[in-house]
From Swiss-Prot:
It catalyses: ADP-D-glycero-beta-D-manno-heptose = ADP-L-glycero-beta-D-manno-heptose. Its cofactor is NADP(+). This is ADP-L-glycero-D-manno-heptose-6-epimerase. The keyword Nucleotide-binding does not apply. Pathway: Nucleotide-sugar biosynthesis; ADP-L-glycero-beta-D-manno-heptose biosynthesis; ADP-L-glycero-beta-D-manno-heptose from D-glycero-beta-D-manno-heptose 7-phosphate: step 4/4. NADP(+) binds at residues 11-12, 32-33, 39, 75-79, 92, 143, 173, 181. Substrate binds at residues 172, 183, 190, 204-207, 217, 296. One of its GO terms (biological process) is ADP-L-glycero-beta-D-manno-heptose biosynthetic process. It comes from Polaromonas naphthalenivorans (strain CJ2). The lineage of its organism: Bacteria, Pseudomonadati, Pseudomonadota, Betaproteobacteria, Burkholderiales. Homopentamer. Contains a large N-terminal NADP-binding domain, and a smaller C-terminal substrate-binding domain.
Length: 335
């Protein structure tokens, strides 16, 4: 069974390869752009059949150069929500995805692709329906445009799909193998490094009607993202657009105190309440950056109705358990 993973050296892509390997699947073509060379580390401990540069792959795949491919996990994209170059964003996230979809349809290959919660943008309702889709940046728009293209081709719920097409609106994903992402890495990753360097972590202060560190997101652990992708891989009859979050909004303060207490525990120090951590100078609230005003989601919470209706009953980790596991992984990786 041949599988393609695009963005395979990236955060979610490499974890998908890891998840497939855990099932004994290694006939995997890993597709990426290794201009940022240190991303190779995400593939170094994994088993793949071949690697191909993204610049070469898409045309060759469309020509049928790889024989029958069972499924493409399409994670390759520009995921920088602050990227200002709209032409670059649309070429990478929209046009390329449209071409890949056509090639998959022509070859009877299943397509499981990364959409994004950024498609909702300024909405206060996070349900897979057009009236709630209000992107705040060109990244979110590029993802929404491809979802809209799929709806035109396959029907609103992809009910006309002859071969599986499933899009996943990832919420705030965090976990191992994101170290290459720079400013786009999760808050938990940055706070790990901040605490190691300075003994404190940083959060935004008041913004959007929320108090310091009170902005709320649906934080989802990478292992859960992989598990849901693989559930759909196991259920080829299921197509559509699905939110992939926990269904729980939690404040950034929850992430911060989980980081602080897990790292304190590794130093044999007692856990602290949020108030005590703030009082002790371990959580530092900073002014909200002007560049993000009007482009920032202060609240997200996935509506899991469509996911559950499809039959996926996966139980998601909360911030406390997921961030704790991640901090332990980062500590072990550093040592």
């Amino acid at each position: 069974m041949k599988i393609v993973v695009t963005g395979a050296a990236g955060f979610i892509g490499s974890n998908l390869v890891k998840g497939l390997n855990a099932r004994g699947i290694d006939d995997i073509i890993a597709v990426d752009d290794l201009t940022q060379g240190d991303k190779f580390r995400n593939l170094a401990d994994l088993r793949i059949a071949d690697y191909m540069d993204a610049g070469d792959f898409y045309d060759r795949f469309a020509e049928g150069a790889f024989g029958h491919v069972e499924a493409v996990f399409h994670e390759g994209a520009c995921s920088d929500t602050m990227e200002p170059d709209g032409k670059y964003m649309m070429a990478n996230n929209y046009t390329l995805s449209c071409n890949l979809f056509r090639a998959c349809q022509n070859q009877n290959t299943r397509l499981l692709y990364a959409s994004s919660a950024a498609t909702y943008g300024g909405s206060d309702t996070f349900s897979e329906s057009p009236e709630f889709e209000k992107p705040l940046n060109v990244y979110g728009y590029s993802k929404l445009l491809f979802d809209q293209h799929m709806r035109r081709e396959l029907g609103m719920r992809f009910e006309n799909a002859q071969t599986q097409v499933a899009g996943f609106r990832y919420f705030n994903v965090y976990g191992p193998r994101e170290q290459h992402k720079g400013r786009m890495a999760s808050v938990a990753f940055h706070q790990f490094n901040q605490f190691q360097a300075d003994g404190k972590v940083k959060l935004f202060g008041d913004y959007g009607g929320y108090g310091p560190g009170g902005q709320m997101r649906d934080f989802v652990f990478i292992d859960d993202v992989v598990a849901v992708n693989l559930w759909f891989f196991d259920h080829p009859e299921k197509s559509g657009i699905f939110n992939l979050g926990t269904g729980r909004a939690q404040p950034f303060n929850d992430v911060a105190i989980a980081v602080v207490n897990t790292l304190r525990q590794s130093q044999n120090a007692a856990p602290l309440s949020l108030e005590d951590a703030v009082r002790g100078g371990m959580i530092d609230y900073v002014g909200f950056p002007e560049a993000l005003v009007g482009k920032y989601q202060s609240y997200t919470q996935a509506d899991l109705g469509a996911l559950r209706a499809a039959g996926c009953q996966h139980v998601f980790a909360d911030v406390q358990s997921g961030v704790t596991a991640y901090m332990q992984w980062l500590s072990n990786a550093k040592n």
